[in-house]
């Protein structure tokens, strides 16, 4: 069993300015589960994953691949599906990917 308390999250910069990640775990196939925090206007460039990815919006509004998502919305992407992520407002999302993420843009 692995437990990560919200109060104990360790936020680290995650590439683009205004994007931070709190890692829950890395898996054996190179994927990971984490919470990502985006400032309004922050953008994760277009990319794809070698495996499937699941996203749940916990707070705020984001667009992923041009689709607007709000608190409670869920998105599943297949391996190889390209998308970017933009913080329409300050936002927090849960992201779980099966495999590593190669950059596209």
Predicted regions and their residues:
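A short, N-terminal "cap"/entry segment at the start of jelly-roll beta-barrel domains
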Residues: 1-30
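Ligand-binding loop in jelly-roll beta-barrel domains
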Residues: 19, 79-104
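Short histidine-centered beta-strand/loop micro-motifs
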Residues: 25-26, 34-36, 45-49, 66-67, ...
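Short, charged/polar surface micro-motifs in flexible loops or helix N-caps
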Residues: 29-31, 40-42, 101
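Structural motif
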Residues: 31-35, 55, 91-92
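Short acidic-glycine-tyrosine-enriched beta hairpin
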Residues: 64-84
């Amino acid at each position: 069993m692995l437990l990560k308390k919200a109060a104990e999250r360790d936020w680290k910069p995650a590439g683009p300015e205004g994007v931070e990640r709190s890692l829950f775990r890395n898996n054996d196939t190179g994927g990971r589960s984490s919470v990502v925090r985006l400032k309004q206007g922050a953008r994760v460039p277009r990319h794809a994953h070698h495996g499937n990815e699941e996203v749940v919006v916990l707070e705020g509004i984001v667009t992923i691949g041009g689709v607007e998502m709000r608190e409670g919305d869920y998105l599943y992407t297949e391996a190889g599906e390209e998308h970017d992520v933009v913080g329409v407002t300050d936002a927090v999302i849960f992201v779980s990917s099966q495999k590593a993420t190669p950059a596209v843009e």
